[in-house]
Protein backbone atom coordinates (compact mmCIF):
# COMPACT_ATOMS: atom_id res chain seq x y z
CA UNK A 1 0.00 0.00 0.00
CA UNK A 2 1.36 3.45 -0.95
CA UNK A 3 2.20 5.68 2.06
CA UNK A 4 -0.34 8.42 2.79
CA UNK A 5 1.24 11.74 1.71
CA UNK A 6 -0.55 13.45 4.59
CA UNK A 7 1.51 11.36 7.00
CA UNK A 8 4.81 11.17 5.11
CA UNK A 9 5.41 14.62 3.57
CA UNK A 10 7.62 16.70 5.97
CA UNK A 11 5.36 19.78 5.90
CA UNK A 12 1.97 18.08 5.57
CA UNK A 13 2.97 15.76 8.41
CA UNK A 14 3.24 18.74 10.78
CA UNK A 15 -0.17 20.08 9.75
CA UNK A 16 -1.63 16.58 10.03
CA UNK A 17 -0.27 16.10 13.55
CA UNK A 18 -1.58 19.50 14.64
CA UNK A 19 -4.98 19.75 12.97
CA UNK A 20 -6.13 16.39 11.60
CA UNK A 21 -4.87 13.30 13.43
CA UNK A 22 -4.19 15.14 16.70
CA UNK A 23 -5.39 12.88 19.57
CA UNK A 24 -7.91 14.95 21.55
CA UNK A 25 -9.80 14.25 24.80
CA UNK A 26 -13.39 13.39 23.83
CA UNK A 27 -15.00 15.43 26.62
CA UNK A 28 -13.55 18.92 26.07
CA UNK A 29 -16.30 21.54 26.18
CA UNK A 30 -16.90 24.74 24.20
CA UNK A 31 -14.41 26.49 26.53
CA UNK A 32 -11.69 24.75 24.49
CA UNK A 33 -12.84 26.56 21.32
CA UNK A 34 -11.11 29.84 22.13
CA UNK A 35 -7.61 28.71 21.16
CA UNK A 36 -8.61 28.21 17.52
CA UNK A 37 -10.72 31.39 17.64
CA UNK A 38 -7.65 33.34 18.77
CA UNK A 39 -5.72 31.91 15.82
CA UNK A 40 -8.47 33.06 13.44
CA UNK A 41 -8.56 36.49 15.16
CA UNK A 42 -4.80 36.82 14.63
CA UNK A 43 -5.04 35.92 10.93
CA UNK A 44 -7.94 38.35 10.42
CA UNK A 45 -6.06 41.15 12.19
CA UNK A 46 -2.90 40.56 10.14
CA UNK A 47 -4.83 40.56 6.83
CA UNK A 48 -6.98 43.64 7.60
CA UNK A 49 -3.95 45.38 9.13
CA UNK A 50 -1.82 44.73 6.06
CA UNK A 51 -4.51 46.19 3.78
CA UNK A 52 -4.90 49.22 6.07
CA UNK A 53 -1.12 49.74 6.18
CA UNK A 54 -1.16 50.00 2.37
CA UNK A 55 -3.22 53.21 2.71
CA UNK A 56 -1.75 54.59 5.96
CA UNK A 57 0.87 57.33 6.26
CA UNK A 58 2.98 57.19 9.43
CA UNK A 59 3.52 60.93 9.74
CA UNK A 60 2.10 63.15 12.49
CA UNK A 61 0.75 65.69 9.98
CA UNK A 62 -0.88 63.09 7.72
CA UNK A 63 -1.81 60.08 9.90
CA UNK A 64 -5.28 61.31 10.93
CA UNK A 65 -6.09 62.42 7.37
CA UNK A 66 -4.85 59.13 5.89
CA UNK A 67 -7.16 57.12 8.18
CA UNK A 68 -10.04 59.43 7.22
CA UNK A 69 -9.12 58.99 3.54
CA UNK A 70 -9.10 55.18 3.93
CA UNK A 71 -12.62 55.28 5.37
CA UNK A 72 -14.01 57.71 2.77
CA UNK A 73 -12.24 56.98 -0.52
CA UNK A 74 -10.80 53.46 -0.43
CA UNK A 75 -13.06 50.62 -1.63
CA UNK A 76 -14.41 49.02 1.56
CA UNK A 77 -11.80 50.96 3.55
CA UNK A 78 -14.43 51.74 6.20
CA UNK A 79 -15.12 48.01 6.54
CA UNK A 80 -11.42 47.18 6.89
CA UNK A 81 -11.00 49.79 9.59
CA UNK A 82 -14.14 48.72 11.48
CA UNK A 83 -13.17 45.04 11.30
CA UNK A 84 -9.62 45.80 12.45
CA UNK A 85 -10.67 48.02 15.38
CA UNK A 86 -13.49 45.75 16.58
CA UNK A 87 -11.50 42.61 15.76
CA UNK A 88 -9.02 43.77 18.42
CA UNK A 89 -11.87 43.92 20.97
CA UNK A 90 -12.96 40.42 20.02
CA UNK A 91 -9.35 39.23 20.22
CA UNK A 92 -9.22 40.41 23.84
CA UNK A 93 -12.63 38.93 24.69
CA UNK A 94 -11.39 35.57 23.39
CA UNK A 95 -8.02 35.75 25.17
CA UNK A 96 -9.63 36.71 28.51
CA UNK A 97 -12.10 33.82 28.20
CA UNK A 98 -9.21 31.52 27.20
CA UNK A 99 -7.22 32.57 30.30
CA UNK A 100 -10.32 32.22 32.49
CA UNK A 101 -10.76 28.69 31.15
CA UNK A 102 -7.11 27.97 31.96
CA UNK A 103 -7.52 29.21 35.54
CA UNK A 104 -10.79 27.34 36.13
CA UNK A 105 -9.66 23.99 34.73
CA UNK A 106 -6.08 24.06 36.03
CA UNK A 107 -4.51 24.23 32.56
CA UNK A 108 -1.71 26.33 34.10
CA UNK A 109 -0.16 23.10 35.41
CA UNK A 110 1.23 22.66 31.89
CA UNK A 111 3.82 25.25 32.91
CA UNK A 112 5.60 25.80 29.58
CA UNK A 113 2.33 26.18 27.68
CA UNK A 114 0.99 28.56 30.35
CA UNK A 115 4.14 30.71 30.49
CA UNK A 116 4.33 31.09 26.71
CA UNK A 117 0.62 32.01 26.84
CA UNK A 118 1.29 34.79 29.36
CA UNK A 119 4.14 36.09 27.16
CA UNK A 120 1.67 36.03 24.24
CA UNK A 121 -0.80 38.09 26.31
CA UNK A 122 1.89 40.68 27.11
CA UNK A 123 2.90 40.90 23.43
CA UNK A 124 -0.75 41.28 22.40
CA UNK A 125 -1.23 44.10 24.95
CA UNK A 126 1.86 45.89 23.61
CA UNK A 127 0.61 45.48 20.02
CA UNK A 128 -2.86 46.83 20.86
CA UNK A 129 -1.36 49.80 22.72
CA UNK A 130 0.96 50.90 19.89
CA UNK A 131 -1.86 50.30 17.39
CA UNK A 132 -4.23 52.59 19.29
CA UNK A 133 -1.76 55.47 18.82
CA UNK A 134 -1.69 55.21 15.00
CA UNK A 135 -4.93 57.09 14.09
CA UNK A 136 -3.32 60.10 15.85
CA UNK A 137 -6.56 61.36 17.40
CA UNK A 138 -6.75 63.11 20.78
CA UNK A 139 -7.06 59.91 22.83
CA UNK A 140 -4.33 58.23 20.75
CA UNK A 141 -1.92 61.07 21.47
CA UNK A 142 -2.71 61.54 25.15
CA UNK A 143 -2.94 57.80 25.81
CA UNK A 144 0.55 57.42 24.34
CA UNK A 145 1.80 60.35 26.44
CA UNK A 146 0.36 59.04 29.72
CA UNK A 147 1.35 55.38 29.32
CA UNK A 148 4.88 55.94 27.97
CA UNK A 149 5.38 58.51 30.74
CA UNK A 150 5.04 55.66 33.25
CA UNK A 151 8.57 54.56 32.31
CA UNK A 152 9.83 57.72 34.03
CA UNK A 153 8.93 56.01 37.34
CA UNK A 154 11.90 53.65 36.83
CA UNK A 155 14.57 54.86 39.28
CA UNK A 156 17.68 56.61 37.92
CA UNK A 157 17.21 55.78 34.20
CA UNK A 158 13.47 56.62 33.98
CA UNK A 159 13.65 60.01 32.25
CA UNK A 160 16.28 58.84 29.75
CA UNK A 161 14.14 55.76 29.04
CA UNK A 162 11.06 57.87 28.26
CA UNK A 163 12.94 60.26 25.97
CA UNK A 164 14.52 57.28 24.22
CA UNK A 165 11.04 55.73 23.68
CA UNK A 166 9.64 59.06 22.44
CA UNK A 167 12.60 59.88 20.20
CA UNK A 168 12.52 63.44 21.55
CA UNK A 169 11.18 65.50 24.44
CA UNK A 170 7.51 64.74 23.81
CA UNK A 171 5.27 62.38 21.84
CA UNK A 172 5.77 63.54 18.25
CA UNK A 173 6.52 62.35 14.72
CA UNK A 174 9.42 60.01 15.69
CA UNK A 175 7.14 58.34 18.27
CA UNK A 176 4.43 57.75 15.67
CA UNK A 177 6.80 56.26 13.08
CA UNK A 178 8.42 53.86 15.55
CA UNK A 179 5.01 52.85 16.93
CA UNK A 180 3.89 52.04 13.38
CA UNK A 181 7.03 49.94 12.86
CA UNK A 182 6.35 48.09 16.12
CA UNK A 183 2.67 47.61 15.34
CA UNK A 184 3.62 46.08 11.99
CA UNK A 185 6.27 43.79 13.50
CA UNK A 186 4.66 42.51 16.71
CA UNK A 187 1.78 40.49 15.16
CA UNK A 188 4.36 38.34 13.37
CA UNK A 189 6.13 37.83 16.70
CA UNK A 190 2.74 36.80 18.14
CA UNK A 191 2.32 34.31 15.26
CA UNK A 192 5.73 32.74 15.93
CA UNK A 193 5.09 32.62 19.69
CA UNK A 194 1.77 30.91 18.92
CA UNK A 195 3.70 28.10 17.24
CA UNK A 196 5.87 27.75 20.36
CA UNK A 197 2.70 27.74 22.50
CA UNK A 198 1.20 24.96 20.34
CA UNK A 199 4.45 22.97 20.32
CA UNK A 200 4.42 22.85 24.12
CA UNK A 201 0.68 22.07 24.18
CA UNK A 202 1.01 19.14 21.76
CA UNK A 203 3.87 17.80 23.89
CA UNK A 204 1.45 17.07 26.75
CA UNK A 205 -1.89 17.01 24.94
CA UNK A 206 -4.98 18.98 25.93
CA UNK A 207 -6.35 19.12 29.45
CA UNK A 208 -10.07 18.30 29.91
CA UNK A 209 -12.94 19.46 32.16
CA UNK A 210 -12.39 16.58 34.62
CA UNK A 211 -8.66 17.25 34.90
CA UNK A 212 -7.87 13.52 34.60
CA UNK A 213 -5.53 11.79 32.12
CA UNK A 214 -7.38 10.94 28.91
CA UNK A 215 -4.69 8.98 27.06
CA UNK A 216 -6.78 5.80 27.12
CA UNK A 217 -9.73 7.47 25.40
CA UNK A 218 -8.82 9.98 22.69
CA UNK A 219 -10.42 10.82 19.35
CA UNK A 220 -8.95 12.51 16.24
CA UNK A 221 -9.26 16.29 16.04
CA UNK A 222 -10.77 16.09 12.54
CA UNK A 223 -13.72 15.82 11.91
CA UNK A 224 -15.03 16.07 15.49
CA UNK A 225 -13.38 19.25 16.77
CA UNK A 226 -12.75 20.88 13.39
CA UNK A 227 -16.54 21.00 12.93
CA UNK A 228 -16.98 22.23 16.51
CA UNK A 229 -14.41 24.99 15.89
CA UNK A 230 -16.20 26.07 12.70
CA UNK A 231 -19.41 26.44 14.73
CA UNK A 232 -17.44 28.53 17.26
CA UNK A 233 -16.13 30.66 14.38
CA UNK A 234 -19.68 31.26 13.07
CA UNK A 235 -20.85 32.27 16.54
CA UNK A 236 -17.87 34.63 16.87
CA UNK A 237 -18.29 36.19 13.42
CA UNK A 238 -21.89 37.13 14.21
CA UNK A 239 -21.10 39.63 17.03
CA UNK A 240 -18.02 40.89 15.12
CA UNK A 241 -19.99 41.67 11.97
CA UNK A 242 -22.89 43.13 13.99
CA UNK A 243 -20.44 45.41 15.79
CA UNK A 244 -18.46 46.37 12.66
CA UNK A 245 -21.52 47.03 10.49
CA UNK A 246 -24.11 48.48 12.88
CA UNK A 247 -22.19 49.97 15.84
CA UNK A 248 -18.57 50.39 14.70
CA UNK A 249 -17.80 53.19 17.18
CA UNK A 250 -19.54 51.70 20.22
CA UNK A 251 -16.29 50.67 21.93
CA UNK A 252 -14.18 53.60 20.70
CA UNK A 253 -13.69 56.99 22.34
CA UNK A 254 -15.41 60.05 20.80
CA UNK A 255 -12.25 62.09 21.58
CA UNK A 256 -10.43 60.14 18.87
CA UNK A 257 -12.49 61.87 16.16
CA UNK A 258 -10.54 65.04 16.99
CA UNK A 259 -7.01 65.25 15.52
CA UNK A 260 -4.19 65.10 18.10
CA UNK A 261 -3.51 68.46 19.73
CA UNK A 262 -0.65 68.71 22.27
CA UNK A 263 -2.14 71.99 23.61
CA UNK A 264 -5.54 70.58 24.63
CA UNK A 265 -5.81 67.76 27.17
CA UNK A 266 -9.01 65.66 27.04
CA UNK A 267 -11.07 65.89 30.27
CA UNK A 268 -10.72 62.15 30.96
CA UNK A 269 -7.83 60.17 29.49
CA UNK A 270 -8.58 56.45 29.40
CA UNK A 271 -7.40 53.47 27.34
CA UNK A 272 -9.57 51.06 25.33
CA UNK A 273 -11.99 48.93 27.40
CA UNK A 274 -9.72 45.87 27.44
CA UNK A 275 -7.03 47.71 29.45
CA UNK A 276 -9.39 49.39 31.92
CA UNK A 277 -8.96 46.77 34.69
CA UNK A 278 -5.18 47.33 34.71
CA UNK A 279 -5.64 51.11 34.38
CA UNK A 280 -7.93 51.09 37.44
CA UNK A 281 -5.25 49.22 39.43
CA UNK A 282 -2.63 51.75 38.24
CA UNK A 283 -4.79 54.71 39.34
CA UNK A 284 -5.76 53.22 42.69
CA UNK A 285 -2.24 53.70 44.10
CA UNK A 286 -1.40 57.36 44.84
CA UNK A 287 2.34 56.81 44.23
CA UNK A 288 3.71 56.75 40.66
CA UNK A 289 6.25 53.93 41.04
CA UNK A 290 3.83 51.94 43.24
CA UNK A 291 1.12 52.31 40.60
CA UNK A 292 3.44 51.14 37.82
CA UNK A 293 4.52 48.11 39.88
CA UNK A 294 0.87 47.24 40.65
CA UNK A 295 0.01 47.63 36.94
CA UNK A 296 2.81 45.23 35.96
CA UNK A 297 1.91 42.83 38.79
CA UNK A 298 -1.76 42.71 37.71
CA UNK A 299 -0.74 40.79 34.57
CA UNK A 300 2.57 39.21 35.66
CA UNK A 301 0.75 37.57 38.60
CA UNK A 302 -0.41 34.98 36.03
CA UNK A 303 3.14 33.57 36.02
CA UNK A 304 2.65 32.65 39.70
CA UNK A 305 -0.57 30.65 39.35
CA UNK A 306 1.16 27.25 38.90
CA UNK A 307 3.03 27.88 42.18
CA UNK A 308 -0.17 28.86 44.01
CA UNK A 309 -2.00 25.64 43.11
CA UNK A 310 -2.46 23.79 46.42
CA UNK A 311 -5.43 21.56 45.59
CA UNK A 312 -5.10 17.80 45.12
CA UNK A 313 -7.58 18.10 42.25
CA UNK A 314 -6.58 19.81 39.04
CA UNK A 315 -9.82 21.47 37.95
CA UNK A 316 -12.50 23.37 39.87
CA UNK A 317 -15.24 21.10 38.48
CA UNK A 318 -15.74 19.38 41.85
CA UNK A 319 -14.57 22.24 44.12
CA UNK A 320 -17.56 24.49 44.89
CA UNK A 321 -15.66 26.77 47.31
CA UNK A 322 -12.93 27.48 44.75
CA UNK A 323 -15.65 28.06 42.15
CA UNK A 324 -17.18 30.73 44.40
CA UNK A 325 -13.81 32.49 44.75
CA UNK A 326 -13.23 32.22 40.99
CA UNK A 327 -16.54 33.94 40.17
CA UNK A 328 -15.85 36.58 42.83
CA UNK A 329 -12.57 37.25 40.99
CA UNK A 330 -14.46 37.58 37.68
CA UNK A 331 -16.95 40.03 39.25
CA UNK A 332 -14.02 41.91 40.76
CA UNK A 333 -12.39 42.30 37.33
CA UNK A 334 -15.67 43.61 35.89
CA UNK A 335 -15.85 46.18 38.72
CA UNK A 336 -12.24 47.23 38.01
CA UNK A 337 -13.08 47.60 34.29
CA UNK A 338 -16.06 49.82 35.15
CA UNK A 339 -14.08 51.93 37.67
CA UNK A 340 -11.28 52.43 35.12
CA UNK A 341 -13.77 54.11 32.78
CA UNK A 342 -14.99 56.56 35.46
CA UNK A 343 -13.42 59.92 36.42
CA UNK A 344 -11.05 60.09 39.40
CA UNK A 345 -13.47 61.33 42.09
CA UNK A 346 -15.02 60.28 45.38
CA UNK A 347 -16.87 56.98 45.16
CA UNK A 348 -14.74 55.62 42.29
CA UNK A 349 -11.37 56.14 44.01
CA UNK A 350 -12.24 54.04 47.07
CA UNK A 351 -14.10 51.41 44.98
CA UNK A 352 -11.01 51.09 42.75
CA UNK A 353 -8.69 50.76 45.75
CA UNK A 354 -10.89 48.08 47.36
CA UNK A 355 -11.26 46.17 44.07
CA UNK A 356 -7.49 46.31 43.45
CA UNK A 357 -6.79 45.03 46.97
CA UNK A 358 -9.38 42.25 46.53
CA UNK A 359 -7.90 41.26 43.14
CA UNK A 360 -4.44 40.56 44.57
CA UNK A 361 -5.79 39.07 47.82
CA UNK A 362 -8.04 36.64 45.91
CA UNK A 363 -5.25 35.31 43.70
CA UNK A 364 -2.37 35.30 46.20
CA UNK A 365 -4.15 34.36 49.45
CA UNK A 366 -7.74 33.16 49.02
CA UNK A 367 -7.19 30.60 46.23
CA UNK A 368 -4.36 28.70 48.05
CA UNK A 369 -6.22 28.92 51.40
CA UNK A 370 -9.53 27.65 50.03
CA UNK A 371 -7.76 24.86 48.11
CA UNK A 372 -6.03 23.70 51.30
CA UNK A 373 -9.36 23.83 53.16
CA UNK A 374 -11.03 21.73 50.44
CA UNK A 375 -8.23 19.15 50.68
CA UNK A 376 -8.96 18.84 54.41
CA UNK A 377 -12.74 18.64 53.87
CA UNK A 378 -12.23 15.86 51.31
CA UNK A 379 -9.81 14.06 53.67
CA UNK A 380 -6.93 14.21 51.19
From Swiss-Prot:
Keywords: Electron transport, Heme, Iron, Membrane, Metal-binding, Mitochondrion, Mitochondrion inner membrane, Respiratory chain, Transmembrane, Transmembrane helix, Transport, Ubiquinone. It is a multi-pass membrane protein. GO terms for molecular function: metal ion binding; ubiquinol-cytochrome-c reductase activity. Binds 2 heme b groups non-covalently. Its cofactor is heme b. One of its GO terms (biological process) is mitochondrial electron transport, ubiquinol to cytochrome c. Heme b b562 binds at residues 84, 183. A ubiquinone binds at residue 202. SUPFAM superfamilies: a domain/subunit of cytochrome bc1 complex (Ubiquinol-cytochrome c reductase) (SSF81648), Transmembrane di-heme cytochromes (SSF81342). GO terms for cellular component: mitochondrial inner membrane; respiratory chain complex III. Pfam families: Cytochrom_B_C, Cytochrome_B. The chain crosses the membrane at residues 34-54, 78-99, 114-134, 179-199, 227-247, 289-309, 321-341, 348-368. CDD domains: cytochrome_b_C, Cytochrome_b_N. Heme b b566 binds at residues 98, 197. Gene3D superfamilies: Cytochrome Bc1 Complex, Chain C. It is found in: Mitochondrion inner membrane. Component of the ubiquinol-cytochrome c reductase complex (complex III or cytochrome b-c1 complex) that is part of the mitochondrial respiratory chain. The b-c1 complex mediates electron transfer from ubiquinol to cytochrome c. Contributes to the generation of a proton gradient across the mitochondrial membrane that is then used for ATP synthesis. Heme 1 (or BL or b562) is low-potential and absorbs at about 562 nm, and heme 2 (or BH or b566) is high-potential and absorbs at about 566 nm. The cytochrome bc1 complex contains 11 subunits: 3 respiratory subunits (MT-CYB, CYC1 and UQCRFS1), 2 core proteins (UQCRC1 and UQCRC2) and 6 low-molecular weight proteins (UQCRH/QCR6, UQCRB/QCR7, UQCRQ/QCR8, UQCR10/QCR9, UQCR11/QCR10 and a cleavage product of UQCRFS1). This cytochrome bc1 complex then forms a dimer. Belongs to the cytochrome b family. This is Cytochrome b. It comes from Asio flammeus (Short-eared owl). The lineage of its organism: Eukaryota, Metazoa, Chordata, Craniata, Vertebrata.
